[in-house]
Regions:
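Short, small/polar residue-rich loop motifs at catalytic or cofactor-binding pockets
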Residues: 107-110
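Minor-groove-contacting beta-hairpin "wing" of winged helix-turn-helix DNA-binding domains
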Residues: 38-41
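Generic secondary-structure boundary/loop-capping signal
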Residues: 22, 104-105
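Active-site/ligand-binding-proximal alpha/beta "capping" segment
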Residues: 98-104
Length: 133
């Protein structure tokens, strides 16, 4: 048997803020989930994403502590166009989420930006640049 990636799990400090952020990115998160300690949503292709509060993680791993220093996890969202990268970046930063890299035309042929989620983790927004289309 070959293992297969089935779920991406995120540990969050504020469930409602995290779910609101990822809803803005188009994830279909249940509307009544904001006060739940564990939430899952289906992703295209059968993959799942899950959010757990810090308390949930500590309930089965009492030694768990939040990471310090640089965050090593990043999620990347493919946008339909370079204009959508710019618009989504403006929407998220306008809603108070910190921008890490303003939209720019990356040398690898993408319009690319990074905004931080409520726990300070980078979320990339990208689309093939107009020249690469």
């Amino acid at each position: 048997m070959t293992p297969r990636l089935d779920m991406i799990g995120l540990v969050v400090s504020d469930m409602a803020a995290s779910l609101a952020f990822y809803r803005r990115l188009g994830l279909d998160v249940p509307a009544d989930a904001d006060s739940q300690p564990h939430v899952e949503a289906a992703l295209p292709g059968g993959l799942r994403i899950a959010w757990d509060t810090e308390d949930v993680v500590r309930s089965f791993d009492p030694s768990w502590t939040p990471p310090t220093g640089g965050v090593r996890r990043e999620l990347a969202f493919l946008c339909d166009s370079p204009a959508e990268v710019d618009a989504l970046y403006a929407e998220l930063t306008g809603a108070g989420h910190p921008g890490h890299l303003k939209p720019w035309d990356a040398f690898w042929g993408q319009r690319y930006a990074v905004v931080l989620d409520p726990d300070g983790c980078g979320v990339s927004l990208f689309a093939p640049s107009d020249a690469a289309r």
